[in-house]
């Protein structure tokens, strides 16, 4: 049985939750150092053999949208007092350190910002700093610390009068659910996803009564957040081997992303591949091929940053459909792309898959 693997989680905040799980026919791709979460161990199910072709986990360095949960609480750029001006500069330095992959420096700067925020009793600065600290802990895999910091952020937001159905509260709740998923706390994870999805679906239903030109941007953000919640929940359901439910979640997420972002958006391509993986895990190889073929076509058109991984995914599904010659050609194309991007991890994986395909071809001749 050839193996099919999921993409790795999306960028920044979601990345710490670990690699996306393999389908039930597959073992997970070995983790890279530093990753955590449900994918940290290898899974083997349905008697999958020790070797076999699998879909690479994509880095998926893409976001549904980039706003942080407490963005609306960010201190103003036009600070009138010296303390707030200093806090703003510290926060800018911290974010720059995070972008430069200097987490230790960012953490020290954020602690200085938090101290100043408390000393000046600046509630917005306190909230925003907690949010940044929580996000930093999350991407570093410090899940227990991140959980407490996200809860502190939520407490300040709610204490400041923000409603429970506000997108910022739902986004933090999603991050908490992802933490519980990474910790294999199934009851808490599923309850968190259910809260996020039901809250946003109810909010969207109520907003349908508004005129089309009222708060259109806010409604679009709500739809995108719902898509992100569906995506995260589907990922966990697939990990939990609830395949048909995962498929339905991915179908809804893909529909939202296509409607709001468009078919050529990088995140849409990610979701097409994810849905294909869920279908493949259920043995629906022809349906999986349709989605993965479309994802690869679009990835080529837009020069997707993880094109080589999309192609590797496509090759694995072709093998499941016993299209070995075509699979070899796609793997070779994927290898060239991986070498161009100097992705040594993917290069090694694709070479292993080509070697396995050669062994299988010799057995069939």
Curated annotation (Swiss-Prot):
Keywords: Cell cycle, Cell division, Electron transport, Membrane, Mitochondrion, Mitochondrion inner membrane, Repeat, Respiratory chain, TPR repeat, Transit peptide, Transport. Residues 1-52 form a transit peptide. Proteolytically cleaved by PARL. Its main location: mitochondrion. The record marks 70-71 as: Cleavage. One of its GO terms (biological process) is cell division. TPR repeats lie at residues 127-160, 170-203, 220-260, 269-302, 308-341. One of its GO terms (cellular component) is mitochondrial inner membrane. It holds the Pfam family TPR_12. InterPro entries: TPR-like_helical_dom_sf, TPR_rpt, TTC19. It is found in: Mitochondrion inner membrane. The keyword Transit peptide applies. Belongs to the TTC19 family. Binds to the mature mitochondrial complex III dimer, after the incorporation of the Rieske protein UQCRFS1. Interacts with UQCRC1 and UQCRFS1. Interacts with ZFYVE26 and CHMP4B. Required for the preservation of the structural and functional integrity of mitochondrial respiratory complex III by allowing the physiological turnover of the Rieske protein UQCRFS1. Involved in the clearance of UQCRFS1 N-terminal fragments, which are produced upon incorporation into the complex III and whose presence is detrimental for its catalytic activity. This is Tetratricopeptide repeat protein 19, mitochondrial. It comes from Rattus norvegicus. The lineage of its organism: Eukaryota, Metazoa, Chordata, Craniata, Vertebrata.
């Amino acid at each position: 049985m050839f193996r099919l693997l999921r993409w790795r989680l999306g960028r920044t905040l979601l990345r710490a939750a670990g690699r996306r799980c393999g389908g039930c026919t597959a073992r997970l791709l070995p983790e890279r150092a530093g990753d955590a979460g449900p994918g940290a161990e290898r899974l083997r199910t349905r008697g999958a053999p020790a070797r076999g072709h699998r879909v690479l986990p994509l880095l998926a360095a893409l976001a549904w949208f980039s706003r942080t949960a407490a963005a609306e609480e960010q201190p103003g750029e036009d600070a009138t007092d010296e303390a707030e001006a200093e806090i703003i500069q510290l926060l800018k330095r911290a974010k720059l350190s995070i972008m430069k992959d200097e987490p230790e420096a960012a953490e020290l700067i954020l602690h200085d910002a938090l101290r100043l925020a408390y000393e000046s009793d600046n509630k917005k600065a306190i909230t925003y700093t907690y949010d940044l600290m929580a996000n930093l802990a999350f991407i570093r895999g410090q899940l227990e610390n991140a959980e407490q910091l996200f809860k502190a952020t939520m407490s300040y937001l709610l204490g400041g009068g923000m409603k429970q159905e506000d997108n910022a509260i739902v986004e933090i709740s999603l991050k908490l659910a992802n933490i519980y998923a990474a910790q294999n706390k199934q009851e808490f994870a599923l309850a968190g996803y259910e809260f996020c999805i039901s809250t946003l679906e109810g909010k969207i239903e109520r907003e349908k009564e508004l005129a089309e030109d009222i708060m259109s941007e806010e409604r679009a953000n709500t739809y995108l957040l719902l898509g992100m919640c569906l995506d995260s929940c589907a990922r966990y359901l697939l990990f939990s081997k609830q395949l048909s439910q995962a498929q339905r979640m991915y179908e809804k997420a893909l529909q939202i992303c296509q409607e709001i972002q468009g078919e050529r958006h990088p995140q849409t391509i990610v979701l097409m591949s994810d849905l294909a993986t869920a279908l493949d895990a259920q043995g629906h190889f022809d349906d999986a091929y349709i989605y993965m073929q479309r994802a690869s076509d679009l990835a080529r058109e837009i020069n997707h940053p993880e094109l080589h991984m999309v192609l590797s995914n496509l090759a694995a599904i072709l093998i499941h459909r016993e299209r070995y010659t075509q699979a070899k050609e796609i793997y070779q194309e994927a290898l060239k792309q991986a070498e161009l991007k100097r992705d040594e991890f993917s290069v090694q994986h694709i070479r292993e898959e080509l070697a396995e395909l050669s062994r299988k071809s010799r057995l069939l001749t």
